[in-house]
């Protein structure tokens, strides 16, 4: 029979609307307290899923070589949010190089949208602001998708020292001009940004 901790963990894996909406993770305290047999069962379950940031978070909590290899397998996922969450976790553990983080950011930044990696990409770019990443943010500020341009401009402005926060509200009017659908307006705002 499953322990109360394992039952709690399994219940937390079945997320509903509130957990999804609020980004509530699995019960990691219950996961940490499992006996070795149940930890293995939990790891098997998580490796079979790997479809949500919560799975990555729980695999990272387990921290076994097999769990971390499972996270590493997501570095080539078509799901940008999963790829970026995996990148963050593996970079924190020094399992991937700074060059690999940069490569993933350069590949994913132009394609992220809300709910599909935007927040994670910007957070990771802020934590790994190489020159190539900053240049890619500038590119996205002008040529990125409608949802990305404003945020890419704000973060680039900050990373190049032009503002005091990753989204400096005192510069919001400038950032919003980069959100225009009219390319000439974006170009004029870009020149002001730089």
Set out the residue ranges of the language-model regions.
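Extended alpha-helical scaffolding segments
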Residues: 117-194
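Extended repeat-based scaffolds of very large eukaryotic assembly and lipid-transport proteins
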Residues: 1-66, 73-84, 93-99, 106-111, ...
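Alpha-helix capping at helix-to-loop junctions
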Residues: 92-96, 127-130
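Hydrophobic core positions within HEAT/HEAT-like alpha-solenoid repeats
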Residues: 56, 72, 86-88, 119-122, ...
């Amino acid at each position: 029979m499953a322990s109360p901790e394992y039952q709690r963990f399994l219940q937390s894996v079945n997320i509903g609307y509130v957990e999804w909406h609020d980004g509530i993770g699995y019960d990691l305290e219950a996961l940490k307290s499992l006996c070795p047999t149940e930890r293995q069962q939990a790891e098997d379950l998580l490796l079979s899923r790997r479809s949500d940031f919560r799975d990555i978070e729980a695999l990272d909590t387990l921290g076994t070589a097999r769990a971390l290899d499972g996270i590493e397998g997501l570095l080539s996922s078509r799901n940008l949010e999963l790829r970026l969450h995996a990148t963050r976790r593996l970079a924190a553990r020094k399992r991937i190089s700074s060059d690999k983080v940069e490569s993933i950011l350069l590949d994913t930044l132009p394609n992220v949208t809300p709910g599909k990696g935007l927040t994670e990409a910007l957070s990771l770019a802020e934590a790994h602001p190489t020159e190539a990443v900053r240049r890619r943010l500038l590119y996205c500020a002008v040529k990125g998708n409608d949802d990305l341009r404003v945020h890419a401009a704000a973060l680039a402005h900050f990373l190049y020292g032009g503002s005091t926060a990753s989204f400096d509200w005192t510069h919001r009017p400038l950032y919003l001009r980069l959100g225009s659908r009219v390319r000439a307006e974006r170009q004029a705002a870009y020149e002001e940004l730089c």
